[in-house]
């Protein structure tokens, strides 16, 4: 039997779960522990099939709209980490549903910023991807027409505001830092008085994971991003790897998704994971490579992370006796 070829694995750090994802998953699990099954969840709690399937097995029921929840239920309904339009909690209240809000606090920060700009009479631009649940939620914080979506640099070049001197912008939290910087620069060049966030809206986890990929992608033959196709931050990581010159940059939800022909002649491989992807899948993929190669593993770090977001009050441990 011939010896397995050597393969250098470069793990990107940080990778995987962020504080907002941990909070969202813990919210569902704590609700199941405290109230029992079922617990309804509006939209995927985070964009990861492995996580969602695991919660389904524990008794979570995922729906896209509140109308899918039985009228007579007393079970809790959890709003996903991506945030929801204001109409959703209002609808839940009108139906006397018991709701738990697992919206990431950094998304809530964007909602607050938009509300402040609206109160001050500013026309608001939202930099983001249409149809993404986070963008739908942010647009739904204010009356229709109060926020204009900007998706591309071309949009930023051509948009015509009502009053160029009374503008503000906010952004989706999971965008490409480079693409967003280009759009923001164009807006500031065209509208020097535009108001932006005091601290950028792209979240720390998105930024750190992209910076780690920027370090690793130029020095490996291939890079795998563990993540789901509908995960915005995971897709951006793959795009960053391609942009930094990595010859093979792929997105994979599980080891079974990998096309092994693409990795036959590589000698080095980078691995990262989107903010909603669990470390167990990284380990699964490394095990799959270990069956075919002799691995030599190292880690490249771009930042240290120690962020923590408290759970919704109703499911905090101290609320157990309530």
UniProtKB/Swiss-Prot annotation:
Binding annotation for dimethylallyl diphosphate: 47, 82, 132, 231-233, 276
Domain of life: Bacteria
Alphabetically ordered keywords of this record: 4Fe-4S, Iron, Iron-sulfur, Isoprene biosynthesis, Metal-binding, Oxidoreductase
Active site: 134
Residues reported in the UniProt entry to bind [4Fe-4S] cluster: 18, 104, 203
Gene3D superfamilies cross-referenced by the UniProt entry: 3.40.50.11270, 4-hydroxy-3-methylbut-2-enyl diphosphate reductase, catalytic domain
Cofactor dependence: [4Fe-4S] cluster
Function: Catalyzes the conversion of 1-hydroxy-2-methyl-2-(E)-butenyl 4-diphosphate (HMBPP) into a mixture of isopentenyl diphosphate (IPP) and dimethylallyl diphosphate (DMAPP). Acts in the terminal step of the DOXP/MEP pathway for isoprenoid precursor biosynthesis.
The protein, known as: 4-hydroxy-3-methylbut-2-enyl diphosphate reductase 1
């Amino acid at each position: 039997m011939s010896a397995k070829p050597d393969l250098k694995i470069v793990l990107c750090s940080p990778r995987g779960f962020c504080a907002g994802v941990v909070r969202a998953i813990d919210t569902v699990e704590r609700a199941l522990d405290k109230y029992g099954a079922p617990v309804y969840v509006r939209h995927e709690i985070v964009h990861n099939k492995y996580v969602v399937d695991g919660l389904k097995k524990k008794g979570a029921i995922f729906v896209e709209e509140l109308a899918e929840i039985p009228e007579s239920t007393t079970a809790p309904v959890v709003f996903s980490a991506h945030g929801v339009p204001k109409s959703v909690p209002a609808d839940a209240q009108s139906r006397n549903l018991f709701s738990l809000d697992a919206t990431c606090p950094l998304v809530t920060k964007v909602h607050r910023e938009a509300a402040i700009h609206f109160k001050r009479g500013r026309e608001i631009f939202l930099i983001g991807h249409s149809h993404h649940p986070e963008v739908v939620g942010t647009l739904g914080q204010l009356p229709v027409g109060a926020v204009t979506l900007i998706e591309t640099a071309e949009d930023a070049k051509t948009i015509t505001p009502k009053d160029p001197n009374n503008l503000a912008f906010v952004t989706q939290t999971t965008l490409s830092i480079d693409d967003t910087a280009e759009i923001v620069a164009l807006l500031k060049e065209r509208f020097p008085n535009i108001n932006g966030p005091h601290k950028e809206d792209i979240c720390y986890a998105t930024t750190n994971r992209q910076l780690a990929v920027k370090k690793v992608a130029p020095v490996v033959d291939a890079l795998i991003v563990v993540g789901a196709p509908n995960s915005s931050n995971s897709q951006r990581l793959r795009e960053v790897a391609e942009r930094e010159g990595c010859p093979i940059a792929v997105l994979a939800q599980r080891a079974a998704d990998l096309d092994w022909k693409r990795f036959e002649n590589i000698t080095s491989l980078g691995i990262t994971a989107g903010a909603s992807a669990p470390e167990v899948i990284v380990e699964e993929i490394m095990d799959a490579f270990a069956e075919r190669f002799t691995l030599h593993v190292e880690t490249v770090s771009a930042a240290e992370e120690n962020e923590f977001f408290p759970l919704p009050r109703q499911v905090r441990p101290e609320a157990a006796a309530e």
